[in-house]
């Protein structure tokens, strides 16, 4: 996970993933925005942290179930998933034990095509 060392909501999202049994490695690049650009993230999908798994990008506060579903069957040409911005009721932002709501999970591919994957 590429993130700012001072971002608390990123740390909360990481805690959720670790509680679910995922081994998370954290990187604090000097210039996070430049790192995102170098990875190929479309800037309109930007959030506070970027996760790279098996060469795919996962931007922002994506629920674990959406990441797992994507990794189980990645669409041809796909680059990853994103939850743009910092939605208040997303993983790492929502109060514990509250249902996720008010945001969309967007798929993006190498051609720049955006696809609605899930909506909470």
Give the predicted meaning of each segment:
Residues 14-34:
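Conserved helix-turn-beta segment immediately C-terminal to the redox Cys motif
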Residues 6, 13, 28-31, 63-67:
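Stable alpha-helical elements in mature extracytoplasmic
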Residues 1-20:
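Local sequence-structure signature of Cys/Sec-based thiol-disulfide redox active-site neighborhoods
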Residues 38, 44-120:
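Thiol/selenol-based redox catalytic cores and closely related redox-interacting motifs
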Residues 1, 23-26, 58:
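Short N-terminal micro-motifs specific to bacterial/archaeal maturation
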Residues 5-6, 25, 40:
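Charged, low-complexity surface patches
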């Amino acid at each position: 996970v590429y993130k700012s060392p001072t971002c608390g909501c990123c740390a909360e999202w990481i805690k959720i993933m670790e509680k679910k049994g995922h081994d998370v490695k954290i990187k604090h690049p000097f210039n996070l925005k430049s790192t995102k650009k170098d990875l190929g993230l479309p800037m309109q999908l930007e959030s506070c942290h970027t996760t790279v798994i098996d060469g795919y990008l996962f931007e922002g506060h994506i629920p674990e179930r959406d990441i797992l579903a994507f990794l189980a069957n990645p669409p041809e040409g796909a680059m990853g998933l994103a939850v743009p911005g910092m939605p208040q009721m997303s993983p790492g932002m929502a109060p514990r034990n509250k249902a996720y709501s008010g945001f969309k999970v967007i798929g993006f591919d190498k051609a720049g095509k955006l696809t609605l994957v899930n909506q909470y």
